[in-house]
Each structure stands twice: as C-alpha cells, then as structure tokens.
C-alpha cells in the first residue's frame, strides 16, 4: 500500500514544514505491485499522492546493477518496481521524470501554506496497556491507523482543510504573531487537539498561553482531564486543575468557547464547526473530486491540483485565495498560459 494513504504520508513532511526544512524526501514507488506488474501510470499516481502530502524531493530504489551477460530480465532488486533498461517502460521513463522535475520546481519554492496544526497526542498511546514489547509509529502502524488523530486528519482532508501534524516538543517552540501560531517554518491559524485523554502538563500550559496571546485553540470531542506521566508534582496537578476550572464555556451553536486572554479555547464534536470558529477556510474543490496542496511564494501562491476522481473535469473551480490573475501550467506537457477566472465572494474561481 505504498504511496496510497495521504494521512500516513503527511507525518514526515509535517515536520519539515513546521521546522522550516526546505526539502521533505521520500523513497518513492519501490513496491507498488508484483514484479513487472507496475506501470508508469501507477508510479505517477503514487508520486502525485506524495506531492499532495508535502513531499518535494523523491528518489527511486529499484535500479540495481546487472551484468551485460545476465539472461533477461537481468539481476533484479527484490522489490517489485524495476527502474532499469530491461523493463519495457524504460524508454518512456524520461517523460515521467520530466513531469516530476516540473512539479518539484514549484513545490521546492516558497513555504508551506497550511492552516491547522493537528496535535499528535502520543501520551494516549503511551498510556495504553498491552502485551506488545515495542511500539511503532510509522504511518501504517495501528498507532496511526486506529488513532483519534487519524480520524480528525481524514475529516480535515476530505473537507479540504490544509493541515500539518505537530508533537509536544514542537508545540513548545511556537509563539504568536498577529494572532497566527508561528513555528520555525510556517504560520497557522489554529491548533486542533483530537479526543485526547491525557496531555503533558507543559503542553496544556503552552496551549493556554497561546490562547492568552490571541490564538484560537480547538478541542475535538472533549478536553483532556488528566496529565500524562507517572511522577507528577502536587503543584503541577493543582495548577493543571486550575487551568481547566478557569475555563468558562458558553455555547455558540455546535461549539462551546471560553475566552482566554486575547484568544479562546473551543470544544465541539463537529470538526467543521471548530474550523469555522477558528476562521479556517476549506478548499471547496474537494467537493468536485479534486485535491490540492498550496505554497506561498514571493509573487503569490502555488497550487498543485490533482484530479482524484474517475471523470474528466472541465468547470469553474473555486480557490480559497483572492487573486487578481491566475496562470495554469501543465507539468506533463510543459504548456502554460493565463487562466480564465472570476471573483466570487472573496475567492477566486478558475476554469480548469
């Protein structure tokens, strides 16, 4: 299932985005299907998903040495996609690489433009009892596949919200600038904590501080009622309780919010309602079967748009960006030109 799960792919690029790393690299399309069953279309589909997840540098791991005298198909790498001259698709491989080069010329420029920091509540995983001697945290492990974080990540993605994951340690390095939550690499509109039962004292204290300085911090399916850890000082336990008791929530539709200094803490069982409360807009193109990733550049914004549906799309597509002009570039052919566009209630509609 390599390259087929967007949520799993986004874990590593999230770190690159929040930490200000220019490249997020992936060993890509190593094992898509059985030997000689994968084609370049399968590879492109996998690469597009990596690009949507924030990967902007790739390498292949299927080109191994094979002596000239070795009988066909030559020496093979044990994984199933073979990028070497004995594969019938070798002559066309260059066209895929031209496509990749063109896409990455944009995705390696500028900075990420995501709105939501999705907190990975590792303390809940650590608190689970079980007979497994070693925990794994790869994208396809049950710690991700069965987590409340994944539930929120899928909901955010399906509804067109742009997000990155963030850990406790990374969250402690954030600060507030103009009501935006700023990491070393990017700025975000909100932090989403998803159905966490336990949370480190320092993390909760930081979330409260961010709200106090003007941020909107949102909690999906409740706020943690207990601190993480085995040895907790009475002073910290008392302060943790004081922080929670000080929250005076008032219902506003499907959301309950409490003012904290210049900002607010909000709770709801509806992620869309929480995003609306945090003034986070969605990319409505997802409703048409398109997916995208945005980046900020010196001259505006880049969109990498992928048609994930099984139909051809020729229609007006809304962008969650107000623009004076728009250009289209087809990375497969290299053809570019100005796009037909119109403004619609603060957003830009582009004809694709």
Task: Give residue ranges: language-model regions.
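Carbohydrate-binding surfaces of carbohydrate-active enzymes
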Residues: 1-352
């Amino acid at each position: 299932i390599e390259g087929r799960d967007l949520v799993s792919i986004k874990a590593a690029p999230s770190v690159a985005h929040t930490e200000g790393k220019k490249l997020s690299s992936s060993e890509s399309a190593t094992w898509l299907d059985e030997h000689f069953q994968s084609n370049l279309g399968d590879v492109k589909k996998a690469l597009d998903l990596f690009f949507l997840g924030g990967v902007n540098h790739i390498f292949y791991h299927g080109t191994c040495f094979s002596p000239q005298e070795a009988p066909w198909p030559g020496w093979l790498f044990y994984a199933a996609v073979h990028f070497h001259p004995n594969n019938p698709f070798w002559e066309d491989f260059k066209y895929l690489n031209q496509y990749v080069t063109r896409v990455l010329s944009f995705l390696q420029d500028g900075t990420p433009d995501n709105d939501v920091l999705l907190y990975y509540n590792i303390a809940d995983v650590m608190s689970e009892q079980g007979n497994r001697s070693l925990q794994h945290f790869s994208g396809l492990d049950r710690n991700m596949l069965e987590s409340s974080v994944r539930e929120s990540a899928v909901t955010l993605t399906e509804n067109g919200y742009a997000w990155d994951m963030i850990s406790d340690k990374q969250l402690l390095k954030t600060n507030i600038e103009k009501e935006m939550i700023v990491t070393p690499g990017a700025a975000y509109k909100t932090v989403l904590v998803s159905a966490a039962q336990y949370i480190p004292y320092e993390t909760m204290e930081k979330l409260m501080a961010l709200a106090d300085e003007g941020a909107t911090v949102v909690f999906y399916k409740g706020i943690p009622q207990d601190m993480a850890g085995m040895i907790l000082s009475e002073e910290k336990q008392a302060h943790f309780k004081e922080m929670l008791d000080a929250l005076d929530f008032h219902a506003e539709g499907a959301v309950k919010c409490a003012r904290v200094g210049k900002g607010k803490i909000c709770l709801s069982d509806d992620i869309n309602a929480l995003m609306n409360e945090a003034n986070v807009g969605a990319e409505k193109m997802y409703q048409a079967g398109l997916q995208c990733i945005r980046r900020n550049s010196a001259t505006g914004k880049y969109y990498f748009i992928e048609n994930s549906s099984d139909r051809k799309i020729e229609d007006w597509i809304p962008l969650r960006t107000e623009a004076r002009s728009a250009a289209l570039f087809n990375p497969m052919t290299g053809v570019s030109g100005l796009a037909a566009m119109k403004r619609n209630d603060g957003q830009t509609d582009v004809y694709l």
